Amino acid sequence: MTNLTLALDAMSGDFGPRVTVPAALQALASNPRLKLLLVGIPDIISPMLVNSDTELLSRLQLVPAERVVANDAKPSQAIRNSRGTSMRIALDLVKSGEAQACISAGNTGVLMGLSKLMLKSIEGIERPALMTVLPNLKQRQTVVLDLGANVNCDSRMLVQFAIMGSVMAEEVVGVVNPAVALLNIGTEESKGLDNIREAATILKRIPTINYIGYLEGDELLTGKSDVLVCDGFAGNVTLKTMEGAIRVILSLLKSSDGQKKKFSWLLRIVKKWLQKRMTKRFGHLNPDQYNGACLLGLYGIVIKSHGAANEHAFKAAIEQAVQAVERQVPDRIAARLETALPKSD
């Protein structure tokens, strides 16, 4: 694939262009095939590009927008009044075929609502799901979905998520015959809500899915499964809890001790050595390195970045979009659904 064009909602996120513009330039510098359509308010963005490398600027196009979707906007109202916003225009570029993917750090509810409104759903998918790829303790990666797009999911939706997650594990992560599990409150078959148990029964009957059973929340990072499926409520709470805990641990490892005078010189050396070892061992779990949730189930690629993402994290979201485009994820999901998805009555 030679043409690789992405649309960036440059006004989105807690920090807006202060993060998205530098991240865009970094992404361009690391990928010579990449072209970016930077959607935003010209008067704000143009001054930030004045001293940029001319070669990078030749692969960057500023697409004017008039307004920004507020982070605290109510989705229904914001969607009705979305014309002229950077988010809507970025999605329009995907819909028209001018861009192959959209990346935004904006209001999650509005982004999901607009995406479903403007981009066609893949046949056989009732509702799209938010998915991310997490590193695990086996130095591999686990596909996790749904992360908040759907609070209530019936068994059929969970099965659809499992199929989409399996495709992602194969095509993006590169896992052969990925192991698929359902997030539950126990590993026994009798545990959990009816929708989870019903989904398990269906998944066992699909020959193209390597279903291995239930996993509990404390096994998210163990690498026992390549795909972990759950409803959006459980997934969002689990992800946010895990990210918060990891950030606290990493900050403690990097922080200086305020009581250094009480340590002997030998203990200080040992402490620094331990910090380096632990950071090297667990640094790959830093949430900034896997920022970006892909909205699966649409004929179009949409990546949702954390609103509080820094430059490094937003660049990671751009790179995730590149991977999804290169692997032609929507087409591969559609092809798998034709053969794997149980037909509805």
From Swiss-Prot:
It is found in: Cytoplasm. The keyword Cytoplasm applies. Pathway: Lipid metabolism; phospholipid metabolism. SUPFAM superfamilies: Isocitrate/Isopropylmalate dehydrogenase-like (SSF53659). It comes from the Bacteria. One of its GO terms (cellular component) is cytoplasm. Keywords: Cytoplasm, Lipid biosynthesis, Lipid metabolism, Phospholipid biosynthesis, Phospholipid metabolism, Transferase. InterPro entries: FA_synthesis (IPR003664), Phospholipid_synth_PlsX-like (IPR012281). It catalyses: a fatty acyl-[ACP] + phosphate = an acyl phosphate + holo-[ACP]. One of its GO terms (molecular function) is phosphate:acyl-[acyl carrier protein] acyltransferase activity. The keyword Transferase applies. Pfam families: FA_synthesis. Its EC number is 2.3.1.274. GO terms for biological process: fatty acid biosynthetic process; phospholipid biosynthetic process. PANTHER family: FATTY ACID/PHOSPHOLIPID SYNTHESIS PROTEIN PLSX (PTHR30100), PHOSPHATE ACYLTRANSFERASE (PTHR30100:SF1). Catalyzes the reversible formation of acyl-phosphate (acyl-PO(4)) from acyl-[acyl-carrier-protein] (acyl-ACP). This enzyme utilizes acyl-ACP as fatty acyl donor, but not acyl-CoA. Homodimer. Probably interacts with PlsY. Belongs to the PlsX family. This is Phosphate acyltransferase. It comes from Photorhabdus laumondii subsp. laumondii (strain DSM 15139 / CIP 105565 / TT01) (Photorhabdus luminescens subsp. laumondii). The gene is plsX.
